[in-house]
Amino acid sequence: MARFQEFYRETVVPKLIEQFGYKSVMEVPRIQKITLNMGVGEAVADKKVMDHAVADMQKIAGQKPVVTKSKKSIAGFKIRENYPVGCMVTLRRGQMYEFLDRLVTVALPRVRDFRGVSGKSFDGRGNYNMGIKEQIIFPEIEYDKIDALRGMNITITTTAKTDDEARALLAAFSFPFKN
């Protein structure tokens, strides 16, 4: 069992029950999935860029990403329908907790001039979105072997009904919020 999964069961659940007064353990919000999405617009000109992005994402997530394709042709962006434009990974259960552990304890502290993540990036339904500007903050990526700095979106989907519940859940996992 992942370290954060055990931590959730033994520490976070009792803390949230006390804070919000839930009657059942099943009412306590939990993290359903973490989705990593990397848009690779440069892949239109050079197909190797997509291969590098997929390889980086696979190292970070520990799981093979799905290549996302364009839904329709857009002449201004020089893309046609079904062109590869990005890649994404959905993490659940053990791998999700392992990734969250690495994100909070290793990756985020390695961000340059890091002062915490925004507490305003909740969507109103208890889900949290954040962006990362460069993939080199993850220890799995070797700085010498990357071809370009690429960012990614990280979406944390929870069962929380409100943003306050989701914020309390992520704060219990020692998520570094600014405000």
From Swiss-Prot:
Single Gene Ontology MF annotation: tRNA binding
GO biological process terms held by the UniProt record: translation
InterPro entries in the record: Ribosomal_uL5, Ribosomal_uL5_bac-type, Ribosomal_uL5_C, Ribosomal_uL5_CS, Ribosomal_uL5_dom_sf, Ribosomal_uL5_N
Cysteine pairings via disulfide bonds: none
Swiss-Prot/TrEMBL keywords: Ribonucleoprotein, Ribosomal protein, RNA-binding, rRNA-binding, tRNA-binding
Pfam families, A to Z: Ribosomal_L5, Ribosomal_L5_C
Keyword rRNA-binding: yes
The UniProt record lists the keyword rRNA-binding: yes
One cellular component term from this protein's GO annotations in UniProt: ribonucleoprotein complex
Subunit structure: Part of the 50S ribosomal subunit; part of the 5S rRNA/L5/L18/L25 subcomplex. Contacts the 5S rRNA and the P site tRNA. Forms a bridge to the 30S subunit in the 70S ribosome.
Protein role: This is one of the proteins that bind and probably mediate the attachment of the 5S RNA into the large ribosomal subunit, where it forms part of the central protuberance. In the 70S ribosome it contacts protein S13 of the 30S subunit (bridge B1b), connecting the 2 subunits; this bridge is implicated in subunit movement. Contacts the P site tRNA; the 5S rRNA and some of its associated proteins might help stabilize positioning of ribosome-bound tRNAs.
Family: Belongs to the universal ribosomal protein uL5 family.
Descriptive protein name: Large ribosomal subunit protein uL5
Source organism of the structure: Thiobacillus denitrificans (strain ATCC 25259 / T1)
Chain's gene name: rplE
